[in-house]
């Protein structure tokens, strides 16, 4: 299976993909370069599939990849709840895609970045 090097060492690349995947799960929409988005899509699709499985082994596999970041959500009544990104993945994100067989993300092109002309995209959960 091929992958993009993204101009980084393997440990730097893995850390960046973990950060981007965690941010995408928390915010459900991030802006990044096209190459990074295509790589993070692979990781997030695997994490959502693990979330759909929902067993202990899947939770531990996802916990090894997803960062332990706090997520603050507000419900319709204005009550704030705090949980971890992993909990949001298993309790909120994955159940939305119970009937869907893959294709959990969408990549929309934004245009070139002003500084270096790199193609910028928005990756979001469908």
Curated annotation (Swiss-Prot):
Source organism's superkingdom? Bacteria
Q: Name one GO molecular function term.
A: structural constituent of ribosome
Pfam families per the UniProt record, alphabetical: Ribosomal_L17
Q: Which UniProt keywords apply?
A: Ribonucleoprotein, Ribosomal protein
Keyword Acyltransferase among UniProt keywords: no
Which interval of the chain is the signal sequence? none
- Cellular component terms (Gene Ontology): cytosolic large ribosomal subunit
Keyword GTP-binding listed: no
GO biological process annotations for this chain's record?
Answer: translation
Q: How does it assemble?
A: Part of the 50S ribosomal subunit. Contacts protein L32.
Q: Which family does it belong to?
A: Belongs to the bacterial ribosomal protein bL17 family.
Name of the featured protein:
Large ribosomal subunit protein bL17
């Amino acid at each position: 299976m091929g992958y993009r090097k993204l101009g980084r060492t393997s440990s730097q690349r893995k850390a960046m993909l973990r950060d981007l995947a965690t941010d995408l799960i928390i915010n459900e929409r991030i802006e990044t370069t096209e190459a990074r988005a295509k790589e993070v899509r692979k990781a997030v699709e695997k994490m959502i599939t693990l979330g759909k499985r929902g067993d202990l082994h899947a939770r531990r596999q996802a916990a090894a990849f997803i960062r332990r970041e706090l997520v603050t959500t507000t419900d319709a009544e204005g009550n704030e709840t705090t949980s971890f990104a992993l909990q949001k993945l298993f309790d909120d994100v994955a159940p939305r895609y119970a009937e869907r067989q893959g294709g959990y993300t969408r990549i929309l092109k934004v245009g070139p970045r002003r500084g270096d002309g790199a193609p910028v995209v928005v990756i979001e959960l469908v």
